[in-house]
Amino acid sequence: MDCHPAGAHYNKDRLTPDSVSRGFISVMKKIRILVTGGTFDKKYDELTGRLFFRETHVPEMLRLGRCRLDVAIETVMMIDSLDLDDDGRARIVQQARTSDETAILVTHGTDTMVQTARALATAGLSAKTIVLTGAMVPYAFGSSDGLFNLGSALSFVQVLPPGVYIAMNGQHFPWDVVRKNTATGFFELVNTP
């Protein structure tokens, strides 16, 4: 999905207001978004009161956020992260590995986000910047943190050095020093010695 206006690409031969911001050149990277489901993409069935998956909300969210980035969206799976096993994580790793893009954003359920981040970080993808994000409240509810988290993660994936990160609530964390605090509903740094 190309969600930036025509002519917004960086042209190394001609600097434009789109390519220069506050004294530095902003080179637009193509970003691969790997969709895996999670609360981020759940819908609510009013008749049964159950949450379920149909299709991703990411294209709509990018449109509402007036995204100007060059992104490719790929649905890898639509699953609750509590149901995600090692085979599912291997699929996510494989999609990241075969992606031509070096900037990869993964939408993911928050319960096992750190485990998937670990799988990506130990898969030999050291030349790529991979950011995982999700939501505590489904986007379909309207009061979701998903749109904010997606926007933050899109910014982080463009500027962070290669590595694997988790981006939630406007913050980013290296994958190996973060945990989800189930009492507060926030991600936080792990106490390290």
Across the structure, where does each feature detected by a protein language model lie?
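Short, positively charged and aromatic/hydrophobic N-terminal segments
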Residues: 9-10, 23-24
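Short, flexible coil/linker elements and helix-boundary hinge sites characteristic
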Residues: 10-12, 124
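Active-site histidine-anchored catalytic micro-motif
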Residues: 28-193
